[in-house]
């Protein structure tokens, strides 16, 4: 595993689950760019036997359908060595193929299955959640060497459908982990690991601007000043930039402008939003 900044408690807990002698169903969630996928890849790298990432629904030309997601899952199976199989038509078939694959390669050692961006796979009327339930309840939870790790940036989906599930997946998670942005101290540690020398005042400013998100902090160039790095990371159109920051600025500035323009006699929260 490469050097991971911070995340000491998270790494320790994930390693503890990795070494347990029982089936584990782990859900990791948190906002975008916070480092969920990176952390999971690094901790479970040596034991990961299957990895799949759901297709983003945010396509400019079309919205991803159940057929698209199933085809992508089929390609992941083939990529991992499942030759001679027909593309699944339902999620029940897809998870059954995954069962067959895991059974075929089982040598008794820990099997980590990582499904990234799980919420994206649950398209309308796809039966995805029911199939996931059948996979875990009917097969996975009896496999003492299986560790199913799911991840997603759509935190509300993870919370509603896994953590607070009232159906067949009620209480099935063995670990739920919310990954938070870096603290101020971890941000300083991150900059030091990248050879970026800044005063603590500038580190604090960077933290206030970028919020301790590792993906954004990684844009910093040690040859640039704080102002130059912020320009490159956020504002320069010709450079790679975290566009989410720009959209967040626009949203908050619009909200502030709406509140600022509310007449003084309009004091209720509801009335403020009517002007937004």
Predicted regions and their residues:
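Phosphate-binding site recognition
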Residues: 1-276
